[in-house]
Amino acid sequence: MELKPNVKEIPGPKARKVIEEHHKYMATTTNDPNEYFLVIERAEGVYWIDVDGNVLLDFSSGIGVMNVGLRNPKVIEAIKKQLDLVLHAAGTDYYNPYQVELAKKLVEIAPGDIERKVFLSNSGTEANEAALKIAKWSTNRKMFIAFIGAFHGRTHGTMSLTASKPVQRSRMFPTMPGVVHVPYPNPYRNPWGIDGYENPDELINRVIDYIEEYLFEHYVPAEEVAGIFFEPIQGEGGYVVPPKNFFKELKKLADKHGILLIDDEVQMGMGRTGRMWAIEHFDIVPDIVTVAKALGGGIPIGATIFRADLDFGVSGVHSNTFGGNTVAAAAALAVIEELQNGLIENAQKLEPLFRERLEEMKEKYEIIGDVRGLGLAWGVEFVKDRKTKEYATKERGEIVVEALKRGLALLGCGKSAIRLIPPLIISEEEAKMGLDIFEEAIKVVSERHGYKIH
């Protein structure tokens, strides 16, 4: 049966009961019963079906996890096959061929033609924690640079790198010492008021100069910095695409001072941007790459892929229990195969459709301040006023709700942006359908608040 968005009542009676019980028994995280009231029972292709039978087109990919589809048959087949062999083989103490096969594949597809090794874990946070330890151990340095707007995890180590929302650090000090944050080259919003679309080189120079002339000249000893953590496109910070040459200049700076470049591909890797890795758009080879989310196709897994010469070399410095889980490894291998069998090309093919439609919406609706993206990773930022760029956070939430009521699942990012990240299996027809619903939601909210529509 061919599915299409079909919503009768959301949240329906069954959903309301689940939401009520959830908040009674589950710890408070990021669930919002007023905005994200989707209670998922099952999935098919690019559609969620909720407990009341509502069908919703997914433009969230389960927060960037389900790139190869919400229930990919090849991934499910690989998982079932592995379940008949072995579920867990203690991969950091005993040996198993499944994790080795995955590590070989990750080294094969990693950016650049250099010798690498892999540490397997269960999440993006753990992948970044491993990167922290690899960088400290291999350089014998203790400091790091990260970017304002970044998200690298929520454990105490990675939380010290994260800087997208103050609430993520609230009552959590002290975090890991030695992390300094600098402005990300956001073409739309930056401390210098530079239009980074019109003057990308000026924006790049300001960020690089800030690191060289303010950090290194005044209070951060460059020779004590182990690594620079970055997202090639900031995710939780608002789906911010930096100027194309930024990472080339950052690499020059890093190489000059012997600093490792650590590329967090947790949200933007695995074909999301129309390349296997988002950093491939920027023509540099990072020293360490971290990946998770979409790697497992729904099964928890993380990986830290690093230059082989950075390896610990001493048993016991770092390890874990579930890293290299056999089922997760089987799922990840199936995901990579699916991506290489046309899904990355599909993201490339649909990029012009998203770019054109979203730019048209920006021209039409004054509430849209900025549109940015690559492949099937798009951010639309909403503002109260295009001149002041005042955040339209409340209106952003209303757009998410109106879309949900019409059968489109979205997620916010940044202070007032929405990310559009459908599974890479989405067809052109489904993409157009989702964009139509998105525009309808924008129109309804614009009319409600009196924003100009051209």
UniProtKB/Swiss-Prot annotation:
Residues the UniProt record annotates as site (Plays critical role in maintaining high affinity for the substrate): 93
Q: What class of enzyme is it?
A: transferase
Q: How does activity depend on pH?
A: Optimum pH is 6.5-7.0.
Task: List, alphabetically, the Pfam families matched.
Answer: Aminotran_3 (PF00202)
> This protein's superkingdom?
Archaea
* Keyword check for Zinc-finger: no
- Give the signal peptide range: none
Q: Which InterPro entries does this UniProt record tie to the protein?
A: Aminotrans_3 (IPR005814), Aminotrans_3_PPA_site (IPR049704), Class-III_PLP-dep_AT (IPR050103), PyrdxlP-dep_Trfase (IPR015424), PyrdxlP-dep_Trfase_major (IPR015421), PyrdxlP-dep_Trfase_small (IPR015422)
Query: What is recorded about the protein's domains?
Result: A 'Glu switch' mechanism prevents L-ornithine from binding in an orientation that would lead to transamination of the alpha-amino group. The side-chain of Glu-236 forms a salt bridge with that of Arg-419, closing the 'Glu switch' and thus preventing unsuitable L-ornithine binding.
Q: What is the protein named? A: Ornithine aminotransferase
